[in-house]
Amino acid sequence: MGVNTAGDPQKSQPKINKGGIGKDESFGALFKPVYKGKKLADPVPTIEDKWQLLPAFLKVKGLVKQHLDSYNYFVDVDLKKIVQANEKVTSDVEPWFYLKYLDIRVGAPVRTDADAIQASISPHECRLRDLTYGANIYVDIEYTRGKQVVRRRNVPIGRMPVMLRSNKCVLSGKNEMEMAALNECPLDPGGYFIVKGTEKVILVQEQLSKNRIIVEAEPKKGLWQASVTSSTHERKSKTYVITKNGKLYLKHNSVADDIPIVVVLKAMGLQSDQEIFELVAGAEASYQDLFAPSIEECAKLNIYTAQQALEYIGARVKVNRRAGANRLPPHEEALEVLAAVVLAHINVFNLEFRPKAVYIGIMARRVLMAMVDPLQVDDRDYVGNKRLELAGQLLALLFEDLFKKFNSDLKLNIDKVLKKPHRTQEFDAYNQLTVHSDHITQGMVRALSTGNWSLKRFKMERAGVTHVLSRLSYISALGMMTRITSQFEKTRKVSGPRSLQASQFGMLCTSDTPEGEACGLVKNLALMTHITTDEEEEPIIKLAYAFGIEDIHVISGRELHSHGTYLVYLNGAILGISRYPSLFVASFRKLRRSGKISPFIGIFINTHQRAVFISTDGGRICRPLIIVQNGLPKVESKHIRLLKEGKWGFEDFLKQGLVEYVDVNEENDSLISVYERDITPDTTHLEIEPFTILGAVAGLIPYPHHNQSPRNTYQCAMGKQAIGAIAYNQLQRIDTLLYLMVYPQQPMVKTKTIELIGYDKLPAGQNATVAIMSYSGYDIEDALVLNKSSIDRGFGRCQVFHKHSVIVRKYPNGTHDRIGDPQRDPETGEVVWKHGVVEDDGLAGVGCRVQPGQIYVNKQTPTNALDNSITLGHTQTVESGYKATPMTYKAPEPGYIDKVMLTTTDSDQTLIKVLMRQTRRPELGDKFSSRHGQKGVCGVIVQQEDMPFNDQGICPDIIMNPHGFPSRMTVGKMIELLSGKVGVLRGTLEYGTCFGGTKVEDASRILVEHGYNYSGKDMLTSGITGETLEAYIFMGPIYYQKLKHMVMDKMHARARGPRAVLTRQPTEGRSRDGGLRLGEMERDCLIAYGASQLLLERLMISSDACDVDVCGQCGLLGYKGWCNSCQSTREVVKMTIPYAAKLLFQELLSMNIVPRLALEDEFKY
């Protein structure tokens, strides 16, 4: 290649065009696009450049942005829609009265303190003071007062919890310096709420999509059904078309029986059988045969006209009107149900039933198609049939419910006032508004803090919608923001919803799911996914008609099913038919790529059903892809250069039509290639980066494509438990439980994901030099051997912070708690040991060492705090009037006081929070893990002198047993060791990104250049004997995480101790100093051994032996040698039984069951 060929005429290229025809340049130009990018010399846009799109994407979308977008949409758009739908409050008593809402908005977060000087409040202050981070909801109203119409602006009607980092939050748009001034961490993801001082996340909820036909089948049982869940603002209901005995029926909750489908269609105005037959069955003989019995059935019922059909249906309608109201005639009832309740998402104007009739016909046809062809059955678990509900949608449902209740309460109260005939002052409705403003606030706070969404209108009862944001590490908080939960019962052991679907590729993370019962039901979003919000439908409908759709009102059944016509759906409702579907779809996409319509609108062709689906609804998962045209990606190096220079953002790539968002259904309509080299002339899209099929948590693993799949899943769970740093403001926070690693390091082997999510700024782990060899017997079963000198130098050292809070209460009778002075010894005047750390203000000093059992807040409560007799003045000076209720330090090891904070809560009580600190070094039994799901406990800590060392004197920090590798097949760990070693020698951080990263050949080559063995093995010398070890040892740096499971928090044993009051058995649990239970299974083992005396000793003598008097005659329990039922002392004997058994007998007696003890002599002979 490098030879200069210009001078030599033989070697110079013949100047013939690629067409091979003479010198005609213009003719050759025709052929140029075909070869562009296909020659070897032309540079293909390299992977290096392309991934720059990722940080640009994560700036505008992704990870936590979906929560923020959803909340912003709710606050800016949905709130106004909800208020417009319920804008007027009228009175039943006075016809002239009305109250109308003109506008609604949410203000900025403010304090609720009465004496606040500065109104705005920061989230950090809410966390510390246990407040709710919320903003006022203001409305503009217009109402009548006497003879005039009054307008008022900015009337507060309640408080809305504010999501952090949303556009209503104090933090939105702030730079790092301003964040620091607010004590907030710039890397904190936001997207959660602060309710009563705890951070609450509304998890993404997964549900089946609304307003779409879903066909299910169980051919073995002879069941086929098409169902639609219609959801509108007013109601939510489910409509089925089912088969029974080969006939089709419509099933709905508001109708008592299943109604034959033909009767329904007749009631909707399709009176001719011919018309119905064409609409449902079309011209295909197989469908006609299946549909014929349904037509016959209608004739058997003697229903021929719409009126007869309506009366048939009307007789079966369930009416839920109030008892007093008179019933409509049956056919009007039926019309109302058909118009408004059945398939509620299809509107009926002026009793024009045609669209709804066609829809039911199509549903019936889909059932027939499924009966003929099993391919037509839908998959419930397919991601395209799912919708994800975000915080905004859930809050909108909640707010709508609360707002409706608020209005109905307001109306009742106004009616109550207006009923009084002799009113002295003029009636002002404004006063009523302010009275009720608590409803909305309380409802919002209750739902967020308990996680129970109970809405009366939709009969929606959901538990566990919100969770406390887990702050174990930065990754655990981030992983929680991308988590998706499905409302599926965890107990059922079905594999369908749990298995990995092919349609989840690139949308949901393939590794990150918990083990155990929630496996596969709790999922996580992949790195580049975005969840759509609702778009306006009107412009899309106009556009569709402009592209030549024929309206559904004017089309006969025959035309509908004629060859080459495709139905066009918009969000599940039928718009019309198109005879040129591919052209229609292509022109739609052209408009989307040129930025004329929203980039999140999806459109795709389904050839099975002969339909085109357009979707603009919220909750679809989509991801960006590079558009490919004529076998060439549209993104070129010059565009990436603009991006690097900061002249372009991600939005520009969308507007220029280089990148587009594709949802799951549209992916089915595309051919996506992963690398440039795979592009063929048919390719439509190119992946931006293949490693984005993993999520944020799985992206931390180096070389995950070399590991066995479940190992990556284990690491996803353990990466969230690794102790590191939580945030930059960690030392300002006072949380219930905080962990901090003393010397965190960023990993030697990084991945692209680590940089994108900022893990390298808040890492959780340390690079340990690991030797893989057997050493002593203490490394069996994954145990690790640790080097004592490494621990002395700070390896694996962490700090644990515990919060203890106490409220100094004020009581209704005028008394209040107080903080007392430390108690002194009466003789010497010294402070007693128990109060050793308490200073003169009754609180422990910061930095004091607290021993177990010492007091650190000397609180005292008045003895008469709970009686409600009002004490005259504060006459409580008597010392005896207080009893001590101090805060005592209960942990087993001494700790240090890190912080003491005094503040007031919003109800004006004084709140004291004390933060305790313990510094812990690794000890036997602490749990560590590498980033490959290889967890192990510390088995032994060895002096450095006894550890093996290499010729440079390097000693390993950890020795790991090689038996952990063969069965687990974590080759990624070995490659990490190799890459890490290279990084140390070169002074660089190597990459171990999924499907990429430093290659083993390159790494080995660099090792050899630096004078090491190419396979990463070293010659070690035994520290015990001083001889060279017989084998070469694989040694190098691996990133190890210390997990939160530490022996000090778990170790527990007891001999004697407290007992439960009721059963007199030892209590349960470590916190109550409980006993260790010998359970049923252990009992069975002892029975099998025949160790009867041991059983007696464990289950009775050491547990709860009890001497009772038993009457030998009647077999009941007596008392002090007297049997109460026989009224004698004759045959009463003493015996020992467990107290729990005695309790059981007495409880049975109380339930009128008489257990009698049949006694035998122990020694008969």
Curated annotation (Swiss-Prot):
Function of the protein: DNA-dependent RNA polymerase catalyzes the transcription of DNA into RNA using the four ribonucleoside triphosphates as substrates. Second largest core component of RNA polymerase III which synthesizes small RNAs, such as 5S rRNA and tRNAs. Proposed to contribute to the polymerase catalytic activity and forms the polymerase active center together with the largest subunit. Pol III is composed of mobile elements and RPC2 is part of the core element with the central large cleft and probably a clamp element that moves to open and close the cleft.
Main location: nucleus
Subunit structure: Component of the RNA polymerase III (Pol III) complex consisting of 17 subunits.
Domain of life: Eukaryota
ZnF segments: C4-type: 1111-1126
Protein's UniProt name: DNA-directed RNA polymerase III subunit RPC2
InterPro entries per record: DNA-dir_RNA_pol_su2, DNA-dir_RNAP_su2_dom, DNA-dir_RNAP_su2_hyb_sf, RNA_pol_bsu_CS, RNA_pol_bsu_protrusion, RNA_pol_Rpb2_2, RNA_pol_Rpb2_2_sf, RNA_pol_Rpb2_3
CDD domains: RNA_pol_B_RPB2 (cd00653)
Reaction equation(s) it catalyzes: RNA(n) + a ribonucleoside 5'-triphosphate = RNA(n+1) + diphosphate
Gene3D superfamilies (alphabetical): 2.40.50.150, 3.90.1070.20, 3.90.1100.10, DNA-directed RNA polymerase, subunit 2, domain 6 (2.40.270.10), RNA polymerase alpha subunit dimerisation domain (3.90.1800.10), RNA polymerase Rpb2, domain 2 (3.90.1110.10)
Phylogenetic lineage: Eukaryota, Fungi, Dikarya, Ascomycota, Taphrinomycotina
Gene Ontology molecular functions: DNA binding; DNA-directed RNA polymerase activity; ribonucleoside binding; zinc ion binding
SUPFAM superfamilies per UniProt: beta and beta-prime subunits of DNA dependent RNA-polymerase (SSF64484)
Keyword DNA damage appears in the UniProt entry: no
The keyword Zinc-finger is assigned to this record: yes
Main EC class the enzyme belongs to: transferase
Binding-site residues for Zn(2+), renumbered to this chain: 1111, 1114, 1123, 1126
Gene: rpc2
Compartments in which it is found: Nucleus
EC number: 2.7.7.6
Chain segments carrying region Disordered: 1-21
